């Protein structure tokens, strides 16, 4: 896929990050992962991110990563595009990006580098090294210690034609507005704060009409209903779902650092699509939290 095709896909509808399936001993479960993708594919996401943040990229080994991307590409070929997560140290990010390209992914989401802080010059060098290592499209993720200024993004865009997307996980409205005003349609933009539905209407007003949904992993129909409500400026439906599900869900998610991933795996287990346990240092939800989440899911009706 050409980079501009990835850009078009990014702007065409709801995106999501499938969970990565692990067995009871914590090993990658390829069969379970393929079955998950087969279940989710028909619901209408414009693309799925394999081995993204919700897919616990941070816990994957260099051997597991290619197997996950290959499984996703083979399972979803002809059904839904696969964008691979890639990140960490520059050389490892390049290794992941090249493995994803070889496997047939449609592009990568460049996740934040690991641990160390860096200035804009260093961040730019990191992104450019990854962009230069592949031919397909790259989406840069503005999150954590990887925070980019409009000027840095403009320089990167000028030097790297395959840098076609910008995902924001910071939530700095002034910065987001500045980036959009400077870059315009050079990038496709994606809302990427945890539980992105809560911020979707505000981001749409900033020129970012699409986002990635984590809850699509266990309530895909509701996730699509909410996305269509945002797209159609249906505030009544948005407010109903925010009040009845998303705000109580947010309160439950915020009980523990790392629950942004754990609660999604819990939801998948509740609806009969168990992806196994989360990997340390994440922890699974407690029994009372599982019960509270089940009550929230049950009142939404069939998916």
UniProtKB/Swiss-Prot annotation:
Pfam families: DHDPS. Its EC number is 4.2.1.41. One of its GO terms (molecular function) is 5-dehydro-4-deoxyglucarate dehydratase activity. Pathway: Carbohydrate acid metabolism; D-glucarate degradation; 2,5-dioxopentanoate from D-glucarate: step 2/2. One of its GO terms (biological process) is D-glucarate catabolic process. It catalyses: 5-dehydro-4-deoxy-D-glucarate + H(+) = 2,5-dioxopentanoate + CO2 + H2O. NCBIfam families: KdgD, PRK03620.1. This is Probable 5-dehydro-4-deoxyglucarate dehydratase. The lineage of its organism: Bacteria, Pseudomonadati, Pseudomonadota, Betaproteobacteria, Burkholderiales.
